[in-house]
A protein has these predicted regions:
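N-terminal "mature-chain" segments and other terminal, solvent-exposed stretches
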Residues: 18-125
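Sequence contexts marking disulfide-bonded cysteines in secreted/extracellular proteins
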Residues: 36-38, 70-77, 164-166, 170-172, ...
């Protein structure tokens, strides 16, 4: 029995949590995500909502139900707007938006919070907030000295978005973190509109 348990324990250690947005409610998986990305990707995200993105392309490619033209795993882990219509936030230009992030396992690197056009997967304007280096530093994390502004912060909705983000599903606020040593990307998205 022990030889069977050890590989499972090792696997569990590789899929343990890393980070995600806690508030406002981030995109989550559902039927639309299964239809676009396949069950393998959705199961991976459901089993560990904070896992890194790098394992998803391989899972997607091996799933016969994966539709590359509908599921961009590098944007919100492929999670679809259609599963999150009840979670759309409405903001106004200039509004300050409080965001809370969970960091479970640190990997020092860089991070940013940006508004992303979901059709083109491009950042609109400049990042709303950026940590060019030193984000999620292991030494600080385990010493319980992680700067508070890495997990609880406010971003301001730009006043020059025009109508770009007036339709639900057109834009997301994306928290993006790259752990340099681990070479792993973590991301979480908030659906929103600007009224």
């Amino acid at each position: 029995m022990l030889p069977q348990i050890l590989p499972l324990a090792a696997f569990a250690a590789t899929v343990s949590a890393h980070g995600l947005i806690l508030s406002p409610t981030p995109r989550g998986p559902g039927d639309a995500s299964v239809a676009a990305c396949g069950q393998s990707v959705v199961d991976n995200v459901k089993n560990d909502k904070t896992s890194h993105v790098e394992g998803l392309p391989e899972l997607a490619a091996a799933d016969p139900d994966y539709k590359a033209d509908e599921c961009n795993v590098w944007l919100c882990k492929g999670l679809q707007y259609g599963d999150n219509t009840a979670n759309v936030q409405t903001y106004t230009a200039g509004q300050s938006v409080p965001i809370e992030v969970q960091l479970s396992i640190p990997h020092v690197g860089s991070a940013n919070v940006s508004i992303v056009d979901t059709k083109t997967d491009t950042i609109i304007g400049s990042p709303l907030l950026s940590w060019p280096s030193g984000y999620a530093d292991e030494r600080q994390f385990y010493a319980h000295t992680t700067p508070a502004n890495q997990t609880k912060f406010n971003v301001t909705i730009p006043d020059d978005l025009g109508t770009q983000c007036s339709e639900a599903g057109a834009c997301v606020i994306q928290w993006w973190w790259y752990g340099t040593g681990a070479r792993q990307t973590y991301e979480s998205c908030i659906d929103f509109t600007v009224a």
